[in-house]
C-alpha cells in the first residue's frame, strides 16, 4: 500500500487528508481498496467517525487504530487486501477489517489472527462498534464540526454518489451479489439531500454509482407502475440534472428504459452528461449465455444506434472479458467484429480469472493463459485504434473542460467524455496561469493521441 493510508490507491484518489487533530483527540487511520463504491463506504465511515469526535490520521504511526476497507472481487484483489492488512498490522498493530473480503472472516483471520475485528460490506455500525472498543471516542460538540458534505477522499471538485447497494443479477463470473446482497435503493430524498450538500460544498461533478444504476428504485414495492415512477432512475436523473453540476452515470445496464434518458442527455441546458458507462462484457450470444448476462448483443447494437440518433455526441464506455471459459476463437472474433460495428468511445478489457465462489469456476473448457493474453492484446490493439480515430476527429473542436490539477508543467483537465481516472485527459501546457482545480474553462483541441487530447484556452 503506502505509508499514508488516507491517500488510498492512487488510481482512486489523490486528495491528502490533513492532520488537524487537537491535543488529546483520538485518531484513526483508513486504508481503502477496490472500486469507487468501496470508496464511498470509506467516506461514510470517516464521516461518522468525525461526527463522533475522532480525527483522521494521515499516517500509520499517528493513528491509534487503522481501518482497512478490503476488496474481494478477484483473487488478486484478495491478496492485495491481505498485504494491506499485514502492512497496517506491522506499522500500527491495531487493525479493524471491513469491506467485501470481510464476508469471509475465516480467510482473513487465518492469515492475520491478530486483527481486532472483521466486518462485512456496508456494516457501518459494526465498524464503529469495533473502533469504540479499540479507541474510545472523545467528542467535543463545540469543536468537532463536520463539513456539510461529510469527509471526502476524492479531490474537492468531484465526488462519487452511491444511490443503491447490492445487485439482483446472477452473472456467473461475479460474487458481488453474494457479498453485498440484493438490490436496495436509497430513498430519492436522501440521495438528493446528499447531492445538494455536495454541490453546495463546491463539487462540480457527481459520479453516480451502484452495482446496477439503471435498476435504481425497482426494489421499491410501493412504487407506481407508470411513467417515471415505474423506473425511478428517470426521475432521479432529471432532478440531479438541475443542481448545476456535471452528473455522470456509471454501471448502467442497457435496459430499454435507458433510452428515455437520452433526450435529457442531449439537452445542453441541464447537467446530465451525454455519457453512459455500460458493462457489456462480451458480444457473442453463447458467451453471454454462459455468463448469465441479462442482455443480448444484437439488441445492444440497436440500442446504441437509437442512443446516437437521439444524442449524436453521446460517449459510450464499456468493459469486456476475454478468455471466458469455453470462449472459442470464432466467438472472440465475433467480439472484435462487434467492436468494429459498435465503435464505442471508451473501451476496457480484462482477462478472465477464477474467483473463489463464482459459478463460472465450474464451467468446462477454460482458456489457456497464453491464449487469453493473445486475445487481450488483439482486443486492446483494436480498441486503441478506435479510440485514436475518435480523438483525432475532435482536433479543431471547441469544448468545455473541468480542471483536475495544475502544476508547473500545465493543467490536467477532462472533457464531458472523460470520467476521472478511468478515461483520458485533456492537457493544457500553455497559458494555464491562474487555473485551479475545479475550474470549468473552454478550450480548442489542437492535438490528439490514442487516449488523450491537448488544447489551448480560448
Curated annotation (Swiss-Prot):
[4Fe-4S] cluster 2 binds at residues 167, 171, 174. PROSITE patterns: MTTASE_N, RADICAL_SAM, TRAM. [4Fe-4S] cluster 1 binds at residues 35, 71, 100. GO terms for molecular function: 4 iron, 4 sulfur cluster binding; aspartic acid methylthiotransferase activity; metal ion binding; protein methylthiotransferase activity. GO terms for biological process: tRNA modification. The keyword Glycoprotein does not apply. It is found in: Cytoplasm. Residues 26-136 form the MTTase N-terminal domain. Its cofactor is [4Fe-4S] cluster. Pfam families: Radical_SAM, TRAM_2, UPF0004. Residues 392-458 form the TRAM domain. Its EC number is 2.8.4.4. NCBIfam families: 30S ribosomal protein S12 methylthiotransferase RimO, MiaB/RimO family radical SAM methylthiotransferase. Catalyzes the methylthiolation of an aspartic acid residue of ribosomal protein uS12. Belongs to the methylthiotransferase family. RimO subfamily. This is Ribosomal protein uS12 methylthiotransferase RimO. The gene is rimO.
Amino acid at each position: 500500500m503506502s505509508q499514508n493510508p488516507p491517500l488510498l490507491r492512487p488510481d482512486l484518489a489523490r486528495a491528502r487528508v490533513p492532520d488537524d487533530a487537537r491535543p488529546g483527540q483520538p485518531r484513526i487511520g483508513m486504508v481503502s481498496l477496490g472500486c469507487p463504491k468501496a470508496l464511498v463506504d470509506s467516506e461514510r465511515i470517516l464521516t461518522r467517525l468525525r461526527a463522533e469526535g475522532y480525527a483522521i490520521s494521515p499516517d500509520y504511526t499517528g493513528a491509534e487504530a487503522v481501518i482497512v476497507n478490503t476488496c474481494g472481487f478477484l483473487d488478486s484483489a484478495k491478496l492485495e487486501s491481505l498485504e494491506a492488512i499485514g502492512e497496517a498490522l506491522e506499522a500500527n498493530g491495531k487493525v479493524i477489517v471491513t469491506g467485501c473480503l470481510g464476508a469471509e472472516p475465516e480467510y482473513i483471520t487465518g492469515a492475520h489472527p491478530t486483527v481486532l475485528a472483521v466486518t462485512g460490506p456496508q456494516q457501518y455500525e459494526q465498524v464503529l462498534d469495533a473502533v469504540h472498543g479499540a479507541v474510545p471516542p472523545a467528542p467535543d460538540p463545540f469543536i468537532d464540526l463536520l463539513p456539510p458534505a461529510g469527509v471526502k477522499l476524492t479531490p474537492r471538485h468531484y465526488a462519487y454518489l452511491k444511490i443503491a447497494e447490492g445487485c439482483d443479477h446472477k452473472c456467473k463470473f461475479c460474487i458481488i451479489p453474494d457479498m453485498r446482497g440484493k438490490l436496495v435503493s436509497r430513498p430519492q430524498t436522501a440521495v438528493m439531500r446528499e447531492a445538494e450538500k455536495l454541490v453546495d460544498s463546491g463539487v462540480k461533478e457527481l459520479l453516480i454509482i451502484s452495482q446496477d444504476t439503471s435498476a435504481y428504485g425497482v426494489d421499491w414495492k410501493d412504487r407506481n407502475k407508470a411513467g417515471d415512477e415505474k423506473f425511478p432512475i428517470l426521475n432521479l436523473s432529471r432532478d440531479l440534472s438541475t443542481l448545476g453540476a456535471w452528473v455522470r452515470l456509471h454501471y448502467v445496464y442497457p435496459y430499454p428504459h435507458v433510452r428515455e434518458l437520452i433526450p435529457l442527455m442531449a439537452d445542453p441546458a441541464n447537467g446530465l452528461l451525454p455519457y453512459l458507462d455500460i458493462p457489456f462484457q462480451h458480444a457473442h450470444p453463447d458467451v453471454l449465455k454462459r455468463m448469465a448476462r441479462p442482455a443480448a448483443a444484437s439488441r445492444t447494437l440497436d440500442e446504441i444506434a437509437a442512443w446516437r440518433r437521439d444524442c449524436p455526441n453521446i460517449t459510450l464506455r464499456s468493459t469486456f472479458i476475454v478468455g471466458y471459459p469455453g470462449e472459442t476463437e470464432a466467438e472472440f472474433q465475433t467480439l472484435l467484429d462487434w467492436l468494429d460495428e459498435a465503435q464505442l468511445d471508451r473501451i476496457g478489457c480484462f482477462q478472465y480469472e477464477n474467483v473463489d465462489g463464482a459459478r463460472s469456476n465450474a464451467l468446462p473448457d477454460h482458456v489457456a493463459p497464453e491464449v487469453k493474453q493473445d486475445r487481450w492484446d488483439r482486443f486492446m490493439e483494436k480498441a486503441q485504434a478506435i479510440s485514436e480515430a475518435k480523438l483525432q476527429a475532435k482536433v479543431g473542436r471547441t469544448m468545455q473542460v473541468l480542471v483536475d490539477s495544475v502544476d508547473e508543467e500545465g493543467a490536467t483537465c477532462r472533457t464531458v467524455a472523460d470520467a476521472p481516472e478511468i478515461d483520458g485527459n485533456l492537457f493544457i501546457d500553455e497559458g494555464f496561469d491562474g487555473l485551479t482545480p475545479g475550474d470549468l474553462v473552454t478550450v480548442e483541441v489542437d492535438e490528439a493521441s490514442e487516449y488523450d487530447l491537448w488544447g489551448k484556452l480560448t
